[in-house]
A protein has these predicted regions:
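Conserved ATP-driven motor cores of ASCE-family P-loop NTPases powering translocation/secretion/packaging/pilus
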Residues: 478-565
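P-loop NTPase motor domains
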Residues: 206-212, 218-219, 223-227, 252-479, ...
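Short secondary-structure boundary/capping segments
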Residues: 230-244, 274-277, 471-475, 507-511, ...
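Glycine-rich phosphate-binding loop of nucleotide-binding enzymes
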Residues: 155-258, 474, 503, 548, ...
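Conserved P-loop NTPase catalytic core
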Residues: 241-276, 507-528, 539-542
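Substrate-engagement module of ASCE P-loop NTPases
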Residues: 200-205, 242-250, 439-445, 476-492
């Protein structure tokens, strides 16, 4: 962050900012039309303006003395375009003559500004010749509406090293909820920025006393990026540390992290199936009893399909029949009694046995399961059930389950719970996400209270809530996007292409963020919050730079965020002297 010439600093909303006076940079251009919403600035020869600079012009308004104390209107705005040309040049070759001193041409620079605030709200344009200044300190906070934010979430730094804030009331559900992040995989740093927003939430004072009970569920859908949130990053430089300090944030890993990984299918013991991260990871699975009584079958058929498909009817009928008939087995918390095709109670000891029983009852034309379904539909259902058993079966244990309570994902045990699914088949990924999110939604719905807040971080939304087709997984996520705000469930979703995600999920996000975009994707209507110039910038953004749009501003702001203080891969993770489970009681 740049320092002022006298080296003085001031505190603005708890963040250190340079204590600089506003700098005159030019005047309102007279050769271009200005309006209350946008205007042009002629840049002085000894000054410059760049994209995202915040500027202010004060203009006299005749006859408005009764509306303004000083008779002046203050219009603030943000630069979104800068241009330059030779004045009085008629031919392309004139530039060479000017360089040789033959033609006395002068370089003119001017900038386009989008208005962000008018005080008082008097909708008149600035006058040509009015002085324009680049603002700092409180004038900048007013221009960007930061002064009206009661609780400010640190979003990162602007191009000139000034802090950028998000109004927390548009994140936590009071006035709006949900965050959506788009960008090219591997370049847009979507997951990293989602992690930074969580870090800012939990390691600043923005949540106040609510921080102790606020939780986050983070799904690690690819690679091992999120499996080291509790480990310091050895690659963090002194410059990165100074950026954290400038934002008023510590440069340390997440303080309270629980890591869950699927049970290893190749081991008879309930050990986690992970790669580089082995210590401090808890294996998760569900029991046959959980599967039957909590209605999990639908999430094994959660690939996008036609909403009118009769397979969905068969799934619903089988699921409800199993729930109705299931009886607990004394002394066996992981298994159940289910009726076979003869109507006799059978002790179901494994997921494989449960699938076989379902198939036997369907082949025996069990009316409770069949209804009026065609035989071809039943055959399709059984083929998919076989596939689900092969791809997800190791996640459902029966009488071979040891201490099942210890392996049930407990999102309340730590502030941040990372649920690893990156090694699973796509069907198994959808199953885990669907089951966990559905259970969370039902628990919050039963509590009837929005507190404590729960944040869900999920990448690759296009897989779990695609625009076309219907699935139980998509239905749950859509429900969260529409009703989660009132229940205190906040979705921080990310995807490469917003055009392939269910439209209502994207549009319900109050905070829209774009990293680097594919040129064709940037032209899609889902990015209507980006101006034409912003779309062009989006295809050039570097890792660590995002375009942030929030309701209080009419245009997106470019935001940069520090390199993660937590490790994102095993090569960055600081070694631990003693392996200690994150699920152990704090010392």
């Amino acid at each position: 962050m740049p320092k002022s010439s006298d080296g003085a600093w001031s505190e603005v909303f708890g963040v250190r900012v340079p204590d600089e006076r506003s700098v005159p940079v030019g005047a309102i251009l007279g050769t271009e039309t200005s309006s209350p919403l946008e205007w042009w600035v002629a840049v002085a020869q000894d000054q410059y303006l760049q994209l995202d600079d915040v500027v202010l012009v004060r203009t006299a308004v005749a006859g408005a003395e009764a509306l303004t104390k000083s008779g002046e209107l203050a219009i603030s705005g943000v630069v979104d375009m800068v241009q330059a040309k030779h004045e009085a040049s008629n031919y392309p070759s004139d530039v060479f003559l000017a360089n040789e001193g033959v033609l006395p041409l002068q370089v003119a620079r001017w900038a386009h500004v989008v208005s962000t605030r008018l005080e008082p709200e008097l909708w008149v344009p600035p006058s040509p010749g009015d002085a324009v200044v680049r603002v700092r300190g409180l004038d900048r906070e007013k221009a960007l509406h930061f002064d009206g934010m009661e609780e400010r979430l640190i979003a990162g730094l602007s191009r000139d090293g000034q802090p950028i804030f998000i109004d927390l009331s548009f994140v936590d559900g009071r006035r709006g909820a949900h965050v959506n992040i788009s960008g090219i995989s591997g370049v847009a740093t979507k997951t990293t920025y989602a992690g930074f927003l969580l870090y800012s939430l939990f390691h600043s004072n923005v949540l106040g006393i609510r921080a102790a009970n606020t939780k986050a569920l983070v799904f690690n859908v690819k690679g091992e990026d999120l499996l080291f949130l509790d480990r310091p990053n050895t690659k963090l430089s002194d410059e990165d540390r100074s950026r954290y300090e400038a934002l008023g944030l510590p440069h340390e890993p997440f303080r309270s992290v629980g890591i869950w990984a699927p049970v290893n299918p190749r081991s008879p013991e309930a050990i986690p199936d992970t790669g580089s991260r082995q210590e401090g990871v808890q294996a998760y699975f569900w029991t046959v009893r959980d599967f039957v009584k909590e209605g999990m079958l639908r999430f094994m058929f959660s690939e996008a399909g036609d909403e009118r498909s009769q397979i969905a009817d068969v799934v619903a009928r089988v699921e409800s029949t199993l729930q109705r008939e299931a009886k607990d087995v004394p002394g066996s918390p992981a298994t159940v009694y289910i009726q076979d095709q003869l109507g006799e109670d059978v002790h179901v000891k494994s997921f494989r046995q449960l699938c076989q029983m379902i198939e036997q009852r369907l082949e025996a034309n069990d009316d409770q399961l069949l209804g009026h379904t065609a035989r071809g539909t039943i055959s399709a259902f059984m083929r998919r059930l076989d596939g689900a058993r092969a791809q997800c079966g190791h996640l459902i244990k029966g009488d071979d389950a040891s201490n099942p309570g210890e392996h049930r994902i407990d999102w309340t045990s730590r502030q941040v719970s990372v649920i690893d699914i990156h090694n699973l088949h796509d069907r198994a990924k959808r199953f885990v996400v669907g089951v966990v999110v559905k259970r969370l939604f039902e628990e919050k719905e039963a509590s009837g209270s929005a507190e404590p807040l729960v944040f869900i971080v999920l990448d690759e939304l296009n897989k779990y809530a695609p625009r076309d087709g219907w699935s139980p997984m998509k239905e749950v996520l859509l429900d969260i996007s529409e009703r989660g705000r009132s229940l205190g469930i906040i979705l921080i979703g990310a995807q490469q292409t917003a055009s392939e995600v269910e439209r209502r999920i994207v549009s319900n996000a109050a905070i829209r963020i774009a990293g680097r975009l594919d040129p064709a994707e940037a032209l899609r209507p889902e990015y209507g919050f980006l101006s034409d110039n912003a779309r062009k910038r989006a295809v050039l953004l570097k890792p660590g730079t995002m375009l942030l749009q929030q309701p209080q501003l009419p245009m997106p702001l470019e935001v940069t965020f520090p390199f993660p203080a937590w490790a994102t891969r095993v090569s960055e993770a600081a070694p631990t002297t003693t392996a200690r489970s994150p699920f152990a009681e704090p010392e």
